[in-house]
């Protein structure tokens, strides 16, 4: 379990599963999707194929989980702006079309630009959804 402070300052515990696109996990992904409380999905802004693969994952999520599951899309490697293959507006429009939040990050730039923010936002969305559905219970939530 990982403790994350939401964007509103609440501290909650989350189970985070990082598949990093590993093919080894393919047989288990549908089961994880069914029990997940939210998704933080990354693609590389300098790799259009990773953006297209992300779209396939979203279809799989929508098929195996509720339509209103919190999703945060993340365009990673924003330090490689000169090599960008996925237009920021295209990513923003896609995120909006599926009801997701969108951020761009870089794990290499000073202070890991927006890395903490994406986890906080995902946590906030999950906690908000959980609180609206189940009053008075703590959130044993999972992010995949």
PLM feature spans:
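Fe(II)/2-oxoglutarate
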Residues: 139-142
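TRAFAC-class small GTPase G-domain
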Residues: 1-134, 144
């Amino acid at each position: 379990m990982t403790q994350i402070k939401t964007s509103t300052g609440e501290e909650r515990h989350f189970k985070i599963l990082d598949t990093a696109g590993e093919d080894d996990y393919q047989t288990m992904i549908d089961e994880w999707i069914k029990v997940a409380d939210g998704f933080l999905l990354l693609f590389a802004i300098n790799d259009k194929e990773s953006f297209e693969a992300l779209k396939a994952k979203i279809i799989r999520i929508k098929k195996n989980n509720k339509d209103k599951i919190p999703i945060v899309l993340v365009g990673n490697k924003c330090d490689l702006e000169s090599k960008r293959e996925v237009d920021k507006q295209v990513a923003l429009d896609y995120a909006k079309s599926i009801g997701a939040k969108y951020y761009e990050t870089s794990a290499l730039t000073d202070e890991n630009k927006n890395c903490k923010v994406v986890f906080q936002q995902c946590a906030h969305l999950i906690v908000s959804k959980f609180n609206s559905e189940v009053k008075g219970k703590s959130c044993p939530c999972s992010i995949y």
